[in-house]
């Protein structure tokens, strides 16, 4: 999966590292391969996309490490030749996928293709959306919540008096890192209405109204100053889907507001989160 090494710590707080930390805590020996870092640094005239270097790296790592299980996350550049090699070694494989796949969510058709592309080459798939979105008869496909990690989500905001009331952060793309001139995120309409209706509430919002997104340690400092957070993902609310924003808010002890249409109240009670119907 993508461990974002090339971003020098800005994207350190990601799902792949949370999962790795969990595997290690359970006593497993984990070897990490950052596919997008490999293809990014190995593009040349003989390997325009860097995928040949990735294939060589994966195969050599398998030969040297001899894993019992290979866990794949958003690794779109893995070739069929590499999957055939993995199968020849009789190694169990699974994939996880955390981008939206529900109707009328960003890039949902493209994201569905990304999941289904590998579905016949892995033993199981884990999605942060209700798998029935892809069809009722899809086998070996399961829901997995966004993971939290005790070494990442270290704040206990419920134990402190915060200077801000409600925190929310978004961006125009994690890899870009900065706001894109002329781009409008559909959530801005909802947020601006929310702010206008609640003038007595102190909002701390990043990624809109000319306020740049926050990342890494700057994100942690910002989120530490609010007692509540808004969990608002792009696109139409989909059963069980949320970005990892949910983990960053609830895991750090913020009282979190969640759209009821996500049906995440199947997992959280009214004493654990606030589920809203609309702006009213």
PLM segments and residue spans:
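A short, histidine- and acid-enriched strand-loop-helix "catalytic/donor-clamping" loop
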Residues: 95-108
């Amino acid at each position: 999966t993508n461990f974002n090494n090339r971003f020098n710590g800005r994207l350190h707080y990601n799902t792949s590292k949370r999962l790795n930390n969990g595997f290690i805590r359970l006593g497993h020996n984990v070897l990490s391969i950052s596919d997008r870092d490999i293809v990014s640094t190995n593009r040349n005239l003989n390997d325009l996309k860097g995928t040949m270097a990735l294939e060589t790296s994966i195969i050599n790592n398998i030969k040297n490490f001899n894993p019992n299980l290979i866990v794949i996350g958003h690794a779109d550049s893995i070739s069929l030749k590499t999957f055939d090699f993995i199968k020849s070694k009789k190694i169990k494989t699974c994939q996880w996928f955390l981008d939206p796949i529900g109707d009328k969510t960003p890039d949902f058709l493209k994201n569905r293709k990304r999941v289904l592309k590998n579905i016949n080459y892995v033993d199981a798939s884990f999605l942060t959306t209700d798998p029935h979105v892809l069809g009722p008869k899809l086998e070996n496909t399961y829901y997995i919540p966004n993971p939290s990690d005790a070494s990442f989500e270290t704040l206990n905001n419920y134990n402190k008096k915060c200077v801000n009331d409600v925190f929310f952060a978004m961006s125009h793309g994690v890899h870009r890192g900065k706001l894109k001139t002329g781009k409008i995120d559909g959530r801005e309409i909802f947020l601006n209405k929310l702010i206008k209706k609640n003038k007595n509430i102190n909002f701390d919002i990043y990624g809109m109204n000319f306020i740049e997104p926050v990342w890494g340690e700057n994100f942690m400092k910002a989120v530490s100053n609010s007692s509540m957070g808004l969990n608002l993902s792009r696109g139409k609310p989909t059963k069980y889907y949320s970005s990892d924003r949910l983990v960053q808010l609830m895991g750090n002890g913020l009282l979190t507001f969640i759209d009821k249409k996500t049906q995440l109240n199947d997992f959280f009670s009214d004493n654990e989160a606030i589920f809203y119907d609309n702006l009213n």
